[in-house]
UniProtKB/Swiss-Prot annotation:
Protein localization: Virion; Host nucleus
Tagged with keyword RNA-binding: yes
Lineage, broadest ranks: Viruses, Riboviria, Orthornavirae, Negarnaviricota, Polyploviricotina
Source species of the chain: Influenza A virus (strain A/Beijing/39/1975 H3N2)
Any single Gene Ontology cellular-component annotation: helical viral capsid
Listed Basic and acidic residues bias regions: 8-21
Descriptive protein name: Nucleoprotein
Modification after translation: Late in virus-infected cells, may be cleaved from a 56-kDa protein to a 53-kDa protein by a cellular caspase. This cleavage might be a marker for the onset of apoptosis in infected cells or have a specific function in virus host interaction.
Alphabetical UniProt keywords: Capsid protein, Helical capsid protein, Host nucleus, Host-virus interaction, Ribonucleoprotein, RNA-binding, Viral nucleoprotein, Viral penetration into host nucleus, Virion, Virus entry into host cell
Family the entry assigns: Belongs to the influenza viruses nucleoprotein family.
GO BP, sorted A to Z: symbiont entry into host cell; viral penetration into host nucleus
A GO molecular-function descriptor: structural molecule activity
Amino acid sequence: MASQGTKRSYEQMETDGERQNATEIRASVGKMIDGIGRFYIQMCTELKLSDYEGRLIQNSLTIERMVLSAFDERRNRYLEEHPSAGKDPKKTGGPIYKRVDGKWMRELVLYDKEEIRRIWRQANNGDDATAGLTHMMIWHSNLNDTTYQRTRALVRTGMDPRMCSLMQGSTLPRRSGAAGAAVKGVGTMVMELIRMIKRGINDRNFWRGENGRKTRSAYERMCNILKGKFQTAAQRAMMDQVRESRNPGNAEIEDLIFSARSALILRGSVAHKSCLPACVYGPAVASGYNFEKEGYSLVGIDPFKLLQNSQVYSLIRPNENPAHKSQLVWMACHSAAFEDLRLLSFIRGTKVSPRGKLSTRGVQIASNENMDTMESSTLELRSRYWAIRTRSGGNTNQQRASAGQISVQPAFSVQRNLPFDKSTIMAAFTGNTEGRTSDMRAEIIRMMEGAKPEEVSFRGRGVFELSDEKATNPVVPSFDMSNEGSYFFGDNAEEYDN
């Protein structure tokens, strides 16, 4: 891992913090959670939601999206300047679901953005509380990562759909700040850079003039973020090359795709945090729990304990399986879309299945879906054990992997070997080592060739009983190696569309 000295912890990123000690970090993260909870309670009052309706995850998503939209300044400016028919740039809203005469009804609500901003600031002691907004963005991003496989997006940028384990955070908005950058996967950063370079190739003025200077510094900043995720000198040197290019073009795209492929074996460090829906924080605050006073961490036992004692409901379509819907949301809550399923099954205490085997669509309900046949059920979000989230890619080793996803991105710091399909990955690296990055390419390929099957990652790290808050007795899990490790295995997940 790169020198921890120069890096800020996630909690510091999450709270724009100067250097803080653990207690201060726990308090400031707790303060952020309190703010989200208070906002949610107030919105439920405004919308006259019953306790049950307030714990409905679909209502939570609508309320979260309303506040994110109210604070999306760039989009708000754009809407003011490009008025479109039937869209009031000053208003925000969405579907709210209520139980009327034993049936679920959809009601479309509309609020002034100004009013939503006022309620949010009031819940956050007058601050804009950007950290809380980012937290909700990351929860939405984690839910997308668990629900959709970004096949089309990968193919469009010239990458391979089997590289989906690198795509964490691919739907995060640009404005998600340092905390957002920390949770983006290598593939997500590569995709953003390739899109930028392609625009530069097609639009002569992209890098020129006053705007071009801003564009250029954004490009270099993104290169540096990606460089910071890599853990080997050769991968980093390659990023320096891409960043320093006078006129980024196809050579840089090649280098970026090469480095993304290499990350399937020489994994980058990507942060993982458990970001829960607002309807979990609201009731906890309402019950009198003081997150700021008690302290809270997104990477320890706290989210597990909170989910252990939370009641969350979801609408269920006629042919969906509530247990499968629960798995989808549970994985999203722990940022675990690309984690090894065998480890997830162990932590959760029930079998976690690949996406293609789940009888469930996304959590959100489209406006044209028929409400008459909608039922609701409790989401089972409890776990058997808890484990510390990781921001390291772990070491590498080899293992039978699947036809769909060919590598994993660990979310938990737990001893295991990380599955990846070495022969499939290495087949992509035949002979392409010419050009100015040839020495780096050769070095990267040599390291990948050397990745050994018996190597164990996170040695000595285990999972913990939920009673073991101080993480004193690690339980090192044993796995059934015959089981499938990849979530998007030979997959048929829906495609993510904005």
